[in-house]
Amino acid sequence: KLDLSFVPSIEYAKNTDYLIVNNISISSLGTVNTVLLTSKTKMEDIKTVAADNRSLSSIVLLKILFKEKFNRLPLFNYTEPDYEKMLSSNDAALIIGDNTFSFERTGKTIYDLSREWFQLTGKPFVHALLCVRNKVQVDQNIIKTILKSRDEGLASIEQISKDEARTLGITKEKCADYLKYKIRYTLGNAEQEGLKEFFSLAFSHGFIKSKPKLNFIGDDN
């Protein structure tokens, strides 16, 4: 087991043993382009969804959107992230991460879940948090190094985009746009409010057993 790691935000809500490292997250405000529901039909008509089994927070987010918008849930089928197989026997597929850059979109209806969340709440969506296990003593220099690495990465986005674009098979410009303008890397007041709203709705719809407080390293817990 790791003592310090990024975890899906919903994982924090389900585990009372975690503390949050402040001022860092993987978040988005509006369109993100890498958490997508692709469908053969309109969202309100979807009856079955194939969900990438790695996408814990995204699955709960999608369920919240269905409950809030239509007061119902389709049937979720959990599977490996094979886009063609996912859509072959389901009305829609939840696709996340690098797979969203390459799948065929022609003739499909695409819903960006981060944009749908923003339209629903007006708040950012926090996809992942940097967490440490409670009672584990983490050297503050390690956290400072992580935050410094984040800042150095942001200062080097052009080169990172060039390298990653080649790996992903997309243009450097598309990669840079994603890293610069689609992803947010902090955990400020706006992100914390979005996280609280996510947990509140997840709890009210029965997707988590309790609504967690945001407990940070250094707080008196």
Regions found by a protein language model. Give the residues of each.
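Conserved beta-strand segments of alpha/beta enzyme cores
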Residues: 19, 74-75, 109
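Short, glycine-/small- and polar/acidic-enriched structural segments
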Residues: 1-45, 53-54, 58
